[in-house]
Amino acid sequence: RQDRIYINPEERINYIFNSSIKGIENSDLILLVGSNPRLEASILNARIRKAYLKNNTKIYSIGDPGDLTYPYEVIGSNTTIVKLIAAGSHEISEKIKKSKKPIIIIGESALYGEAGRYIFETIKKFLFTNNFIRDDWNALNVLTQQASRVGAIDLGLYSIAKNENFPFFDKLDNGSFKFIYLLGADDINFQKDDKFIVYQGSHGDKGAEIADIVLPGAAYTEKNGLFVNLEGKIQNAYKASYPPGDAREDWKIIKDLSKMLKKTEDYKDIHELQKNIKKNITIKNNNNLKNTKIVEFIEKEISIKPIDYYFTNSIARSSKTMNECRRVKKKFLFTGIEKAS
């Protein structure tokens, strides 16, 4: 993670889109929680629109995302609404209970900070109690904004203490670290001060600018690899061209660093590495115990954070086309995304 987004890695259903994108069309009720799917996942938003047009699916939102291209009802914008839903004292509670295939989509804006834990765990418990987390239909869905987030959680690349979800960020803020290794991490905010920073990545973005050492890596188009999508499915990515200059594939850089540090690896080549990754994900996928937690209430506004649509990653920020799109967009006071007043 590069931000304080709450994650519960205990079981895989906690951080993927369980209902599936295709399953949206079968839903009879959709509740958005701190999410703007039009900007965060345009294809997913198109499916929601299709569900509305085809099935007249009712759509509700906690937080106001603006124009989503289909009608919806804002039922509130704070964690009190979540509390009322869980207690069964909000009118939407009964509508969810009476629906056959409801979908709850929790966005990163709702998961930010300590309140994110309350929102997620409370909604999960409500759905589990009402039998909406089962093998044939799981209404719990997390909409991530980072393409690598699901895969990173699958591999255990996170820092979580027993009773603390953000120990890494706390240490980062108080200056506990003297050495930081940024693996393609360009959106993490901290003061460099006297920290020694190594950056490994494909584009000379924010991370490279503050680094003491840069290890040039291959872009996703310049290497074979695996991606885990929103639904938790593993997808293969194939090399379209070779990396320029001294740039190398990420796994080769890490393997050489391991040798220098005299650390042993359980793989010899990329095929063995990918085999181990798939095995690890399969084990985690079969470990869904459907655990629920009771979390102390935290009152907080659920405001949907704006997205710099054309500048969401380092590759987009280095694109001349994306820069031009961003420049043109800034000229318009009304973009079509906002609601007309």
Model-based region annotation:
Residues 2-290, 333-341:
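Non-catalytic alpha/beta scaffold blocks inside enzyme catalytic domains
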Residues 274-341:
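Long, low-complexity segments enriched in small/aliphatic residues
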